[in-house]
Amino acid sequence: NSNDPFTCTTVVTIDEAGGEIQVAANGIPNHDFTSTKGCCTNEEDYDWIFPITAVEDSDGSYESGPARGAVAVAVNGVPMFGPEDGPGGDAVALHHKYYHEDRQQIDLGICGGHSAGSTYHYHWDANCILWQPGDGEDISDYDWTKINSSIHSGIIGWSFDGYPIYGLYGWNEVADVVQVKSSYQLKASGQDGYDGTDDWEYIEGLGDLDECNGMFGPTPEYPDGIYHYVSTPISGSSNTHVDTDGSTVEMIGFPYFLMCYHGEATGGPKGGNSQPPPPGIVHPSGILAGIDSLSESWISQHIRQISGAILILIALAVGLLRKRQPET
C-alpha cells in the first residue's frame, strides 16, 4: 500500500437504445477515497442496464435486492451494494461498532465505501457524491451530517428497476425539508447485525419509508411525484443501541439504500465484479455515446426527458483527475 496519494480518472458514458439506458463506467468515484482492508481499487469495465420507464410491481410481491452485491449504481458509476459484507454480517453495523466480528474484519472508508478485492463500492451514505466542501475543507472533512439540510437532496443513484435514489433530505407533507428516516430497527432477539439482514425488522410507520426503503412523493425533478428510494443514515426508531465501546448510539438506517425493488428490476450489471446480479438482465444493442464532462469540484448533474415517462440523471466524466487517499 502506498503512503502517497495518486491520481485516478472517473469515466462514465451513456447510451439510449432498444428501450433501455446503458451506462458504462470504470468504477472510480468522483471523490478521494480509501480502499481499506480489501485493497486495492482498480478500474473496472462496467456495463449497467436501466429501463427507460420504471414499471411498478403489479402484484406487490416486491423482489428482494441482493444482500451482497450491487443493488443500484451511483451517479458517478460506482456500484451501491446491499447491507452485507463477505462474512455475512451487516457491514454498516460493524462500521458503527454494533457487534464484534470474529470471522473477517471489514472496514468502511470515506462516504461508506470500500473495496472488496479490486471493486470499489458503497454500502451506505454515498451523499458525498454531491457534497461541496467549505473553505479549507476536503473530502477528509466529510461527514453526512454536513450535507445541506435546508434543501431537498439530489439524486445520488439509480436502482435497477429504474427508480431514483435520493440523498437523505426530502419534503414532508407540508413541503418542509426533513431528514428522511428508514422504518427498520434491530430485532430484540437478533445478533446486532452479526447475522446480517436477519437481525433487522421492518415496522410500518416507524420512519418515513416503506419496506423497500422508498416512498412516493414530489421531488425537484418530479414535481408531480414519483416513487423513489432514499439513502438513510438513521432510522426512525426511538430505540438506541449500546455499541462495543459501551456508548449509547442512535439506530442506524438499515437497509441504507434499498431492501427490495418496488418496480420490475429488469436492469442490472453486465460486466465487472459486481456479483451477484439481480435476475432479469436485458441485453441492449447500440454503441456507447453521449460523453459529457464533470465540474472540478463535484459531479455536474445532467437531466433529460426520455419518452415522457422518466428523467434520467446522467453523471459523465472526461479527464477529471482525482486524488486517491493512501490505502490502509
PLM segments and residue spans:
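Short acidic, Pro/Gly- and aromatic-enriched capping/linker segments at domain boundaries
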Residues: 57-69, 141-156
